[in-house]
């Protein structure tokens, strides 16, 4: 609801908050191997008169920092604009220096090779094209991943567009 109107209350059972809680749990669970996590969220901001009122990516990062993850271990892809910046980020994700990366299918899908320690993929929303979900999952389910068993978590709400998109 806060994407529609930032004045809505912060529901502790929202998809965003459930995802944040899972991110914090999995961060600790995979700490010994520096396991990394990717968060896909295509519907992430509301802009009115070019003034952002709510940005889901920034909110996730803020809550992860409050939850104890150091800020330098969390990356929001929109902060990395040049090829060099992205390449450096992806190296840090592969080394486990950056443990959580947040972004969209377009920015973190096709051509992104960050699989070396990728333990968990979080899908806060479902892309409109099935091929995009395949690309998202392809970031984690691939050769070169040192994590033998990975987790893919999809977040949805019954009787909403989520349910229809996930065909549940």
Stretches with model-predicted labels:
Residues 1-4, 42-47, 81-82, 107-109, ...:
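Short, solvent-exposed loop/turn segments at secondary-structure junctions
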Residues 1-69:
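Conserved helicase/translocase motor-coupling segment
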Residues 69-73, 98, 116-120, 145-153:
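Short glycine-/polar-rich loops that comprise or flank the Walker A/P-loop
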Residues 70-105:
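Conserved helicase ATPase core of P-loop NTP-dependent helicases/translocases
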Residues 76-78, 123, 154:
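Structural signal for conserved beta-strand scaffold positions within catalytic alpha/beta enzyme cores
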Residues 105-146:
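Conserved RecA-like helicase motor core of SF1/SF2 enzymes
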Residues 131-168:
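A conserved SF2-helicase RecA2
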């Amino acid at each position: 609801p806060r994407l529609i109107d930032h004045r809505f209350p912060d529901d502790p059972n929202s998809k965003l908050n459930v995802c944040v809680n899972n991110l914090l749990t999995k961060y600790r669970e995979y700490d010994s191997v520096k396991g990394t996590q990717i968060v896909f969220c295509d519907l992430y901001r509301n802009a009115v008169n070019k003034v952002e009122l709510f940005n889901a990516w920034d909110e996730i990062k803020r809550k992860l920092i409050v939850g104890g993850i150091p800020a330098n271990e969390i990356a929001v892809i929109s902060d990395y604009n040049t090829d060099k910046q992205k390449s450096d980020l992806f190296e840090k994700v592969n080394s486990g220096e950056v443990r959580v990366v947040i972004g969209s299918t377009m920015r973190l899908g096709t051509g992104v090779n960050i699989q070396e320690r990728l333990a968990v993929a979080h899908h806060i929303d479902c892309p409109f094209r099935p091929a995009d979900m395949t690309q998202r999952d392809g970031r984690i389910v691939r050769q070169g991943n040192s994590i033998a068993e990975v987790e893919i978590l999809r977040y949805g709400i019954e009787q909403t567009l989520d349910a229809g998109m996930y065909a549940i």
